[in-house]
Amino acid sequence: AVSCGQVDTALTPCLTYLTKGGTPSTQCCSGVRSLKSMTGTKVPDRQAACNCLKQAAARYQGIKDAAAALSQKCGVQLSVPISRSTDCSKIS
């Protein structure tokens, strides 16, 4: 299963982008790709990652727009949204 430690480690390089905006770093996009591979095909992994992302998003105010654009800016299609308001039980 996916742990919150793994999710946090993958997205730590994105904190500057998420809190200040601009362009995500190469390390950040690499973390996003890593997160995509972690959440690949198994629903429990996606739901676990979703819950971790919700907790992480709740720790930082004002990251909503930056977080929503992150996968697009990195050119990675995530199966899990980075949002405080996602109902993780509905992710399939």
From Swiss-Prot:
GO molecular function terms noted in the UniProt entry: lipid binding
The record's listing under InterPro entries reads: Bifun_inhib/LTP/seed_sf (IPR036312), Bifunc_inhib/LTP/seed_store (IPR016140), Plant_nsLTP (IPR000528)
Q: What tissues express this gene product?
A: Expressed in seeds and, at very low levels, in pulp of fruit (at protein level).
Q: Which SMART domains does UniProt cross-reference here?
A: AAI
Keyword Disulfide bond found: yes
Reply yes or no: does the keyword Protein biosynthesis apply: no
Which keywords does this chain's UniProt record carry?
A: Allergen, Disulfide bond, Lipid-binding, Transport
Q: Which cysteines are joined by disulfide bonds?
A: C4-C52, C14-C28, C29-C74, C50-C88
Gene Ontology biological-process annotations:
lipid transport
* Residue runs in coiled coils: none
One Pfam entry name:
Tryp_alpha_amyl
Q: What does this protein do?
A: Plant non-specific lipid-transfer proteins transfer phospholipids as well as galactolipids across membranes. May play a role in wax or cutin deposition in the cell walls of expanding epidermal cells and certain secretory tissues.
Q: What does the similarity note say?
A: Belongs to the plant LTP family.
Name the UniProt record assigns to this protein: Non-specific lipid-transfer protein 1
